Regions:
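Active-site rim beta-loop-alpha module in soluble metabolic enzymes
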Residues: 19
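Loop/turn elements at helix/coil->beta-strand transitions in domains of secreted/extracellular proteins
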Residues: 11-16, 63-66
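Catalytic His-Asp segment of secreted/periplasmic serine-dependent ester chemistry enzymes
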Residues: 22-119
Length: 119
């Protein structure tokens, strides 16, 4: 909220969007080589992932900023999916650092931001 307040102080007429956090951890009960977690640890990791996304959404709401729901946008593209938008534990040279988004995720987020701004 303090970051949004700082932006509002400097640019009172700005339209402020808070970009959310993506789905990283699979919803299923199994992990994969790219996300080497024990099956028993997946629910906790999922809770942390959801918590980060929820915290950004709630922070945007409290600050009266718009929220870009990247969590919903990236559903089905977690690290263990057939079409991951986030790199796993290994850096993919020329594409993404470990646990960072691929270009497909960034493109989807950019398109969603444009959609919101045009509304």
């Amino acid at each position: 909220a303090s970051v949004v307040a700082g932006i509002r102080d400097r640019a009172p007429d700005a339209r402020i969007l808070v970009v959310g956090y993506p789905q990283i951890v699979p919803q299923g009960k199994e992990s994969c080589d790219a996300l080497p977690l024990a099956a028993g640890d997946l629910p906790f990791a999922r809770t942390v992932n959801e918590g980060l996304a929820d915290a950004l959404a709630e922070g945007a709401r409290r600050a009266k900023a718009e929220h870009v729901d990247v969590y919903a946008l990236t559903e089905g593209h977690d690290i263990c999916s057939d079409d991951p938008w986030i790199a796993g534990r290994d850096t993919v040279p020329g594409q993404a650092l470990a646990f960072h988004p691929f270009a497909a995720e960034q493109q989807a987020v950019a398109e969603e931001i444009l959609r919101i701004l045009r509304d």
